[in-house]
Protein backbone atom coordinates (compact mmCIF):
# COMPACT_ATOMS: atom_id res chain seq x y z
CA UNK A 1 0.00 0.00 0.00
CA UNK A 2 2.78 2.43 0.81
CA UNK A 3 5.17 2.78 -2.13
CA UNK A 4 8.44 4.62 -2.49
CA UNK A 5 7.69 8.17 -3.51
CA UNK A 6 8.85 9.89 -6.69
CA UNK A 7 8.73 13.66 -6.94
CA UNK A 8 6.62 15.13 -9.70
CA UNK A 9 5.44 18.65 -10.35
CA UNK A 10 2.26 18.67 -8.26
CA UNK A 11 1.06 21.44 -5.95
CA UNK A 12 0.97 19.90 -2.48
CA UNK A 13 0.14 21.97 0.59
CA UNK A 14 0.94 20.79 4.13
CA UNK A 15 -1.19 22.25 6.93
CA UNK A 16 -1.88 21.53 10.56
CA UNK A 17 -4.75 19.11 11.04
CA UNK A 18 -8.11 20.53 12.08
CA UNK A 19 -11.42 18.82 12.82
CA UNK A 20 -12.95 19.85 9.49
CA UNK A 21 -10.84 17.08 7.91
CA UNK A 22 -11.93 14.37 10.36
CA UNK A 23 -14.03 12.24 7.98
CA UNK A 24 -11.43 12.10 5.19
CA UNK A 25 -8.54 11.40 7.59
CA UNK A 26 -10.55 8.69 9.39
CA UNK A 27 -11.20 7.07 6.00
CA UNK A 28 -7.49 7.19 5.10
CA UNK A 29 -6.58 5.58 8.43
CA UNK A 30 -9.18 2.84 7.83
CA UNK A 31 -7.62 2.16 4.42
CA UNK A 32 -4.21 1.80 6.05
CA UNK A 33 -5.50 -0.51 8.78
CA UNK A 34 -7.34 -2.62 6.21
CA UNK A 35 -4.09 -2.99 4.27
CA UNK A 36 -2.21 -4.02 7.44
CA UNK A 37 -4.92 -6.61 8.16
CA UNK A 38 -4.50 -7.99 4.62
CA UNK A 39 -0.71 -8.36 4.83
CA UNK A 40 -0.57 -9.73 8.41
CA UNK A 41 0.58 -13.36 8.09
CA UNK A 42 -0.46 -14.19 11.68
CA UNK A 43 -3.85 -12.47 11.26
CA UNK A 44 -3.41 -10.54 14.53
CA UNK A 45 -4.21 -7.12 13.06
CA UNK A 46 -7.90 -6.29 12.88
CA UNK A 47 -10.21 -3.53 11.74
CA UNK A 48 -12.70 -3.35 14.61
CA UNK A 49 -16.18 -1.90 14.33
CA UNK A 50 -15.05 1.04 16.49
CA UNK A 51 -11.87 1.77 14.53
CA UNK A 52 -13.24 4.44 12.20
CA UNK A 53 -15.02 6.36 14.94
CA UNK A 54 -12.28 6.10 17.59
CA UNK A 55 -8.80 5.60 16.14
CA UNK A 56 -8.23 9.14 14.87
CA UNK A 57 -9.15 10.59 18.27
CA UNK A 58 -6.72 8.13 19.89
CA UNK A 59 -3.90 9.05 17.47
CA UNK A 60 -4.45 12.78 17.99
CA UNK A 61 -4.61 12.43 21.78
CA UNK A 62 -1.35 10.46 21.76
CA UNK A 63 0.39 13.08 19.63
CA UNK A 64 -0.96 16.15 21.41
CA UNK A 65 -0.27 14.86 24.93
CA UNK A 66 3.37 14.23 23.95
CA UNK A 67 4.19 17.69 22.55
CA UNK A 68 3.30 16.49 19.08
CA UNK A 69 1.37 17.62 16.06
CA UNK A 70 -0.80 16.34 13.25
CA UNK A 71 -0.57 17.37 9.61
CA UNK A 72 -2.64 17.02 6.49
CA UNK A 73 -1.49 17.14 2.89
CA UNK A 74 -3.85 18.82 0.44
CA UNK A 75 -4.02 19.42 -3.28
CA UNK A 76 -6.67 21.80 -4.59
CA UNK A 77 -8.21 21.80 -1.08
CA UNK A 78 -8.65 18.01 -1.18
CA UNK A 79 -7.11 16.02 1.69
CA UNK A 80 -4.62 13.56 0.19
CA UNK A 81 -2.52 12.58 3.21
CA UNK A 82 -2.18 12.63 6.98
CA UNK A 83 0.75 12.40 9.37
CA UNK A 84 1.21 12.66 13.12
CA UNK A 85 4.33 12.95 15.20
CA UNK A 86 5.26 13.38 18.83
CA UNK A 87 8.23 13.85 21.08
CA UNK A 88 9.20 10.57 22.70
CA UNK A 89 8.40 10.53 26.41
CA UNK A 90 11.35 9.34 28.53
CA UNK A 91 10.91 6.88 31.37
CA UNK A 92 13.17 5.67 34.18
CA UNK A 93 14.64 2.84 32.08
CA UNK A 94 15.62 5.32 29.36
CA UNK A 95 17.41 7.46 31.92
CA UNK A 96 19.32 4.44 33.22
CA UNK A 97 20.24 2.86 29.89
CA UNK A 98 20.57 5.62 27.27
CA UNK A 99 22.24 8.97 26.90
CA UNK A 100 18.68 10.11 26.27
CA UNK A 101 18.75 12.06 23.04
CA UNK A 102 15.42 13.70 22.33
CA UNK A 103 13.65 11.74 19.59
CA UNK A 104 10.70 12.56 17.40
CA UNK A 105 8.36 9.69 16.63
CA UNK A 106 6.43 9.44 13.39
CA UNK A 107 3.30 7.80 14.75
CA UNK A 108 1.06 7.97 11.66
CA UNK A 109 1.62 8.42 7.93
CA UNK A 110 -0.91 7.66 5.21
CA UNK A 111 -1.31 8.94 1.66
CA UNK A 112 -4.42 8.46 -0.49
CA UNK A 113 -3.83 5.59 -2.96
CA UNK A 114 -4.13 7.77 -6.07
CA UNK A 115 -1.46 10.14 -4.67
CA UNK A 116 1.20 7.57 -3.79
CA UNK A 117 4.46 7.92 -5.68
CA UNK A 118 3.99 11.67 -6.16
CA UNK A 119 6.08 12.99 -3.26
CA UNK A 120 3.24 13.48 -0.77
CA UNK A 121 4.59 11.08 1.86
CA UNK A 122 8.09 12.47 1.46
CA UNK A 123 6.81 16.01 1.94
CA UNK A 124 4.85 15.04 5.07
CA UNK A 125 7.94 13.37 6.55
CA UNK A 126 10.09 16.41 5.72
CA UNK A 127 7.66 18.68 7.59
CA UNK A 128 7.56 16.28 10.56
CA UNK A 129 11.37 16.22 10.66
CA UNK A 130 11.48 20.02 10.52
CA UNK A 131 9.07 20.20 13.47
CA UNK A 132 11.17 17.63 15.35
CA UNK A 133 14.28 19.76 14.81
CA UNK A 134 12.41 22.79 16.18
CA UNK A 135 11.83 20.70 19.33
CA UNK A 136 15.57 19.87 19.52
CA UNK A 137 15.11 16.23 18.55
CA UNK A 138 18.38 14.52 17.70
CA UNK A 139 16.67 11.62 15.92
CA UNK A 140 13.45 10.83 14.10
CA UNK A 141 12.12 7.28 14.48
CA UNK A 142 9.26 5.30 13.02
CA UNK A 143 7.86 1.87 13.86
CA UNK A 144 7.05 -0.06 10.67
CA UNK A 145 4.96 -3.25 10.65
CA UNK A 146 7.34 -6.07 9.65
CA UNK A 147 5.38 -7.38 6.65
CA UNK A 148 4.96 -3.86 5.24
CA UNK A 149 7.90 -4.04 2.83
CA UNK A 150 6.72 -1.00 0.88
CA UNK A 151 6.83 1.21 3.99
CA UNK A 152 10.25 -0.15 4.91
CA UNK A 153 11.51 0.69 1.43
CA UNK A 154 9.93 4.16 1.58
CA UNK A 155 11.59 5.05 4.89
CA UNK A 156 14.92 3.50 3.85
CA UNK A 157 14.85 5.79 0.83
CA UNK A 158 14.55 8.73 3.21
CA UNK A 159 17.62 7.65 5.20
CA UNK A 160 15.95 5.61 7.97
CA UNK A 161 17.56 2.37 9.07
CA UNK A 162 16.83 -0.49 11.46
CA UNK A 163 17.88 -0.12 15.08
CA UNK A 164 15.63 -2.57 16.95
CA UNK A 165 13.92 -5.74 15.81
CA UNK A 166 10.85 -7.14 17.54
CA UNK A 167 10.69 -10.93 17.43
CA UNK A 168 7.61 -13.02 18.11
CA UNK A 169 6.82 -16.66 18.80
CA UNK A 170 3.34 -18.18 18.99
CA UNK A 171 2.99 -20.07 22.27
CA UNK A 172 -0.22 -22.00 21.68
CA UNK A 173 -2.76 -22.81 19.00
Listing of model-derived features with the role each one plays in the protein:
Residues 1-23, 27, 31-38:
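Conserved N-terminal entry element of GNAT/NAT acetyltransferase domains
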Residues 115, 119-127:
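Conserved acetyl-CoA pyrophosphate-binding loop and the N-cap/start of the following alpha-helix
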Residues 72, 78-87, 105, 110:
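Conserved beta-strand in the GNAT
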Residues 54-71, 105:
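A short helix-loop-beta-strand connector motif used in the catalytic cores of GNAT acetyltransferases and
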Residues 34-58:
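Conserved GNAT-fold acetyl-CoA-binding loop/helix
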Residues 125, 132-144:
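Conserved GNAT acetyl-CoA-binding A-motif
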Residues 84, 89-104:
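Conserved acyl-donor/pantetheine-binding loop and adjacent beta-alpha core of acyl/acetyltransferases
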Residues 141-151, 168-173:
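Conserved beta-strand-loop-alpha-helix junction that forms the acyl-donor binding cleft
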Amino acid sequence: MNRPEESVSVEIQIDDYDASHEKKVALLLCELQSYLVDIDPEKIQLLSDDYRSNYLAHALRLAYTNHGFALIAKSNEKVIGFAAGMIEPKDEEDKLTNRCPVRGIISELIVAPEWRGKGVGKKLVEVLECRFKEENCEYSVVDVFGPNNAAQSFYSGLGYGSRNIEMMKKLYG
